Amino acid sequence: MSATLRGANARFGNLLTAMATPLYPDGSIDFAGAQTLAKWLMAGGNDALVINGTTGESPTTSDDEKLDLLDAIIEAIGADKVVAGAGGNDTRHICKLAAASAAKGVAGILSVAPYYNKPCQEGIYRHFRAIADAAAIPVLLYNVPGRTIANIDTATTERIALDQENVIGTKEASGNMMQVADIVSRTPDTFDVYSGDDGTLLPHLAVGGCGIISVISHVATPQMKAVCTKWFAGDAAGAREAFLLTLGITRMIFAQPSPAPTKAALSLLGKPAGPVRLPLVDLNQSQLEALAAFMTERGLI
């Protein structure tokens, strides 16, 4: 293996954290805390951050909050290190949000497949093309059928990749490694295929993926970075060893609905986090104690 491996020079880098949005106890956004968290994550080794994604509680933040948060994070780390989440099931609405986010100067847009209204593949194709046209900057698709019900089929991903120049990659969280391999085999080498599941990072890399948009990197940036760095340096055994060490962290961080465990872990580290917004709920005392014990045992705190 060498630096010529597909994905080694991914547009946004190999490790991005889907950043949690710090909140005050009353549920309002802690913008200063978000800046502090973003700076800390970047200093730890992230290549870029996804802001206003699912981990950032995008379903329960308003457009105004999303845009204000982008302003704060851009001020903290620079627009070129920010990928803005802009996804939903109302194409016209998301086109406006994507355009407004792009106008902030961010590096790219991450847009999830439309959920609930269960469009056919032609509808998904047209949805993403409309968003990409509206944004007019690099766009990543986000396929997470466990949340959206709608899978972006390989043929649809291929079609968008070939027809829409500024759709430059996808975040695949389908859990279907055959689909991931098919996407890699049917798209140009410049099309970046990110893992959207922390527990599938190494399999993604093995079939030609470029890295990960991670959640556990809030508490394990060096560990996730090591997997990518070793893989692209040609050290497959080292990458495997590093990856296997992350699996317990993944299980713990996803033991309850995300991002509640992530926010609890950040609080244990003394980082800005705060509560989650309903309908999500924070960890209860026993869950928090289990998380603290695990993090202590693993040397994370």
PLM region descriptions:
Residues 80-81, 138, 167, 190, ...:
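Secondary-structure boundary/capping positions in well-ordered alpha/beta enzyme cores
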Residues 133-134, 147-254:
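Catalytic alpha/beta core domains of metabolic enzymes, predominantly
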